[in-house]
Amino acid sequence: MATQSDLMELEMAMDPDRKAAVSHWQQQSYLDSGIHSGATTTAPSLSGKGNPEDDDVDNQVLYEWEQGFNQSFNQEQVADIDGQYAMTRAQRVRAAMFPETLDEGMQIPSTQFDSAHPTNVQRLAEPSQMLKHAVVNLINYQDDAELATRAIPELTKLLNDEDQVVVNKAAVMVHQLSKKEASRHAIMRSPQMVSAIVRTMQNTNDVETARCTSGTLHNLSHHREGLLAIFKSGGIPALVKMLGSPVDSVLFYAITTLHNLLLHQEGAKMAVRLAGGLQKMVALLNKTNVKFLAITTDCLQILAYGNQESKLIILASGGPQALVNIMRTYTYEKLLWTTSRVLKVLSVCSSNKPAIVEAGGMQALGLHLTDPSQRLVQNCLWTLRNLSDAATKQEGMEGLLGTLVQLLGSDDINVVTCAAGILSNLTCNNYKNKMMVCQVGGIEALVRTVLRAGDREDITEPAICALRHLTSRHQDAEMAQNAVRLHYGLPVVVKLLHPPSHWPLIKATVGLIRNLALCPANHAPLREQGAIPRLVQLLVRAHQDTQRRTSMGGTQQQFVEGVRMEEIVEGCTGALHILARDIHNRIVIRGLNTIPLFVQLLYSPIENIQRVAAGVLCELAQDKEAAEAIEAEGATAPLTELLHSRNEGVATYAAAVLFRMSEDKPQDYKKRLSVELTSSLFRTEPMTWNETGDLGLDIGAQGEPLGYRQDDPSYRSFHSGGYGQDAMGMDPMMEHEMAGHHPGPDYPVDGLPDLGHTQDLIDGLPPGDSNQLAWFDTDL
């Protein structure tokens, strides 16, 4: 107990009455001689004020003073009040510092004059209470630690007892101790105790014992020291075993403890995999508690990330279907986000990818593309982009395609990048998808995307590829070719042929220009935008590169930025072939001195290059001057040789060029040429030129899209940041779209009645280029 003198000293220190009186007095205006304060250096005024301007302030103070003490007290009453305050000083201090010691209902008069200004004792109350609680907690903490330290050896023995009742009681006590921080630290510092808890949890058949022991481990797992103790005591296999428990509380404790271990304990991932944790976790995906599912899916993501074996185990356990069901069923944002993260990791696995697609993953992920959660939308887009190359044959994609077209207008660069990439793959070799995208304004949206993207090739390249797919081989292809022009897309498309565009983007743009040239209305605008000189420039550069490599003894095709220069040669020549259908374009092409180069390309060992070279020469040879120039360059010999090509498209174009070159030749020459053409073009089934029937050339046949080939560097994947080390792969699909206006797969060359009828032969040529030219409308 405090002594009387201590209390009196405290009272003196904290008594506000005297201080308040002095302070209040000091605030009043009074006659100051200046001896003590030096406030005045002039004689005071007659009113006794230091400054006559303070009249208003003084009046206000006097008013407030009168308001506060407008009732009169006699001397006896004042002495009585003063006595009451003096008697209750100790109670006021006690009420502030130790309120629990006061008798209930006891009234203590307050010395507070102004409610806005607490007294010294009141200001002391809060910190004194905090100090008291800290001291109490320290005493309790020490007591808990000492109690636990003394009890742990005994409780360890009881947990190992043969009597299950004793074990249960001990487990309950340990669980209670683990709820307090001091005793929890004592438990985790005892390897014997942690081992006993793990062993008891693993071996017990009692539900309550399992709940208490798993709950204890859960409490320990909130500390790094506890995680290490659980790991060293073999807790992970035991916890994995508990994932098969029918009791929800045990399941929750087990999965959350494993989650903490996977997040923070080194070596935990491998231990969980070895204990069969993946299979157990996938089996738990049929539960309905959304928070439990969120933790479980996050565990799966941690285990699968960067580990191919884990991805295959999840696949074998039926994981893709279960994960897709979650995306289709629930609305809890955190669960959808964690599930989409697992699917994103699995979507770069070539084995899991088709399984997710077959389970309806594309449609399920598409449901959340308009969710307000940006992290969920972004994960769904990344996953869809990774899956999209395996989903080109999927049905029921209308809703997804419409949403993707809308997302092209987003201000988020990542969203636009993913949406363009997904559209590029989904429109590849899929007639219905092409129609749908065109019908929902996809052409306009893609052109606008290219215009907005500037030099961001991670956006422009997939957008150009999508346009390339949409402008070829479907019912609305011609409308799409016109729409690109009508939405002011031609200038920006031609501009992409120039620096700083890289070869992959240039390759895609060349293919798009070739498709746009299938529409006669685009011939003049493309010419006016300078497309022809730039195509010739690219052709010359690529051809020189291939020639230089050949002269240095290189036999294998080399890649520049993932693109073979032979592809650029083939693509530019093919685009010029289609553009040459216009007479004015032919004049420009011929004026750029291209005929010698085209003749040289006839000697290429690559059949596709032979065919496009023969094709462009066939168009140019319509003009007599060009036909003479072709002959002057010595084209007769290579063209005659190509008549015997196994590629029927090459042979047909070669025959057409030779025929056009023979227009002004003597009749004997024409007859000899007729015999040569007949014997060459109808080797397997001899017939004469004047026999009716089709030549049967399957020049326009569409090839199947080539699958993903990791050994082919031309197959490139888009990466937008990626998720850790797992590639955000967009495995491109090759699409053979060469003929423009023909929905059917075969475009036979009509039978020609007589070699002398030039126009019949010309009319028999395929209206479009051969679809065997796999370069166009292909990968991203």
Curated annotation (Swiss-Prot):
SUPFAM superfamilies attached to this UniProt entry: ARM repeat
Family annotation (CDD domains): CTNNAbd_CTNNB1 (cd21724)
Compositionally skewed regions (Basic and acidic residues) per UniProt: 735-744
Post-translational modification: Phosphorylation by gsk3b promotes ubiquitination and subsequent degradation by the proteasome. Ubiquitinated when phosphorylated by gsk3b, leading to its degradation.
Annotated region (Disordered), positions in chain: 34-56, 735-770
Repeat (ARM) residue spans along the chain: 140-179, 224-263, 266-305, 350-389, 399-430, 431-472, 478-518, 520-561, 583-622, 624-663
Compartments, record wording: Cytoplasm; Nucleus; Cell membrane; Cell junction
Cytoplasm among keywords: yes
GO CC terms: adherens junction; catenin complex; cell cortex; cytoplasm; intercalated disc; membrane; microvillus; nucleus
InterPro entries: ARM-like, ARM-type_fold, Armadillo, Beta-catenin
Swiss-Prot/TrEMBL keywords: Activator, Cell junction, Cell membrane, Cytoplasm, Membrane, Nucleus, Phosphoprotein, Repeat, Transcription, Transcription regulation, Ubl conjugation, Wnt signaling pathway
GO biological process, one term: positive regulation of transcription by RNA polymerase II
Alphabetized GO MF terms: alpha-catenin binding; cadherin binding; nuclear receptor binding; protein phosphatase binding; transcription coactivator activity
Expressing tissues: Expressed in the successional lamina, also expressed in both the epithelial and mesenchymal cells of the developing replacement tooth (at protein level). Expressed in the enamel organ as well as in the inner and outer dental epithelium during replacement tooth morphogenesis (at protein level). Expressed in the differentiated, polarized odontoblasts that line the dentine matrix as well as in the inner and outer dental epithelium during tooth cytodifferentiation (at protein level).
Disulfide bonds: none
Subunit (UniProt): Interacts with adnpa. Interacts with cdh1 during oogenesis and in the unfertilized egg. Interacts with ctnna1 and cdh2.
Classification via PANTHER family: ARMADILLO SEGMENT POLARITY PROTEIN (PTHR45976)
Function: Key downstream component of the canonical Wnt signaling pathway. In the absence of Wnt, forms a complex with axin1, axin2, apc, csnk1a1 and gsk3b that promotes phosphorylation on N-terminal Ser and Thr residues and ubiquitination of ctnnb1 and its subsequent degradation by the proteasome. In the presence of Wnt ligand, ctnnb1 is not ubiquitinated and accumulates in the nucleus, where it acts as a coactivator for transcription factors of the TCF/LEF family, leading to activate Wnt responsive genes.
Family: Belongs to the beta-catenin family.
Protein name: Catenin beta-1
